[in-house]
């Protein structure tokens, strides 16, 4: 800061960017004219070599940008202005309400209740889940392949384990007579000879006296 006669204020130091002739946000380079205009909307406007630059968008909530030499470049505002213009044009094609900014606030946009959007969310998220499952299958395949330090990992068949668990949990009841398959002898001969008559009956041949099943 400067006091009377252009001298630095007592007890302070003068920054290089604030000296006249040095380019930067706090001073003007030679041949440049800077005009500060305070807007009623609390953002400043500067004109440098006929180019108007403001901090309307970049300075909101971030005063530290004022210390950046590139803070007054018009690219910031130009990019945001182009984006807002595209938002307005896209909104005009799909909606008839007055302003597209209403869609930024749920209480003003008249959005549907989330319960009615469940099917829409499912339609959006389903491709992501399918792609995730597909990627997992690919990873499982590569994981099962042998490596120099690991043997091949075989897929576990779960239905065999579940069947063994059900058999282990089985307990005989009174309806079963309190017996299990292990209570029966394993020496029953189920061999049915050709002369037993049962085969003839199944084939529609004349019925003959069936021979009894032999139990050894």
From Swiss-Prot:
Biased composition range(s): Low complexity: 21-32, 178-187
Family membership: Belongs to the gyrovirus protein VP2 family.
Keyword Cell cycle tagged: no
Record's protein name: Dual specificity protein phosphatase VP2
Induction conditions: VP1 and VP2 are detected 12 hours post infection, while VP3 only after 24 hours.
Active-site positions on this chain: 95
Region annotated Disordered, chain positions: 1-50, 165-187
A molecular function (GO) term: protein serine/threonine phosphatase activity
Domain of life according to the entry: Viruses
Reported function: May act as a scaffold protein in virion assembly. May also play a role in intracellular signaling during viral replication.
Broad class of enzyme this protein falls into: hydrolase
The keyword Hydrolase appears for this protein: yes
Taxonomic source organism: Chicken anemia virus (isolate USA 26p4)
Pfam families with a match to the protein in the record: TT_ORF2-like (PF02957)
Reaction(s) the record says it catalyses: O-phospho-L-tyrosyl-[protein] + H2O = L-tyrosyl-[protein] + phosphate; O-phospho-L-seryl-[protein] + H2O = L-seryl-[protein] + phosphate; O-phospho-L-threonyl-[protein] + H2O = L-threonyl-[protein] + phosphate
């Amino acid at each position: 800061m400067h006091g009377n006669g252009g001298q630095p204020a007592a007890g302070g130091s003068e920054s290089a960017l604030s000296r006249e002739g040095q380019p930067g946000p706090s001073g003007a380079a030679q041949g440049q004219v800077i005009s500060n205009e305070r807007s009623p909307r609390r953002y400043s406007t500067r004109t440098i070599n006929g180019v108007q630059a403001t901090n309307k968008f970049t300075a909101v909530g971030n005063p530290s940008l004022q210390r950046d030499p590139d803070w007054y470049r018009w690219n910031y505002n130009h990019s945001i202005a182009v984006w807002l213009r595209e938002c307005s044009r896209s909104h005009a094609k799909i909606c008839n309400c007055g302003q597209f900014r209403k869609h930024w606030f749920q209480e003003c946009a008249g959005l549907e209740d989330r319960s009615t959007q469940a099917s829409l969310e499912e339609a959006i998220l389903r491709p992501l889940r399918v792609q995730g499952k597909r990627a997992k299958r690919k990873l499982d395949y590569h994981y099962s392949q042998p490596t120099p330090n690991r043997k091949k990992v075989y897929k576990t068949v779960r239905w065999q384990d579940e069947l063994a668990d059900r058999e282990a949990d089985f307990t005989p009841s009174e309806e079963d007579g309190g017996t299990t398959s292990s209570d029966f002898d394993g020496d029953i001969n189920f061999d049915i000879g050709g002369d037993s008559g049962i085969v003839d009956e199944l084939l529609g041949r004349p019925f003959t006296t069936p021979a009894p099943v032999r139990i050894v």
